């Protein structure tokens, strides 16, 4: 059970999203209260939907890009014993490709910042797959110019906001580059 604030209740985009989740049977909306039908549905609404969308896009381009192996929610323990979860990962062109998926507002007080996410993704790529590993941040929300510059410096590809609608094209360009 989750209660929405007045500010949330006044968001047309959120209203549409909640209606879609409600029609899919993921949650029920009663006034300003959300009731999830299960913990799995809550996790799906909280961001699992983006991971599933990204994995499906990877699966759709697998044949075109000669992707050999692919996984979602992959737990990896590196040589130092550090455990990391990779939202989506796949092998192509003898390289590991790692995708981090984010739906949260990374500019919100108290939330994980975009910079932290980018540094973490770059470090995971380095530790788990080595120098040839490529990283991509798929974010439901757009990033600011400073974060885009940081991603470029770190070698992290971005597919954010409205660009998610063209994820398959972005994946093809990313893997082939």
Regions found by a protein language model. Name each.
Residues 1-177:
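Intrinsically disordered, low-complexity Ser/Thr/Pro/Gly-rich regulatory segments
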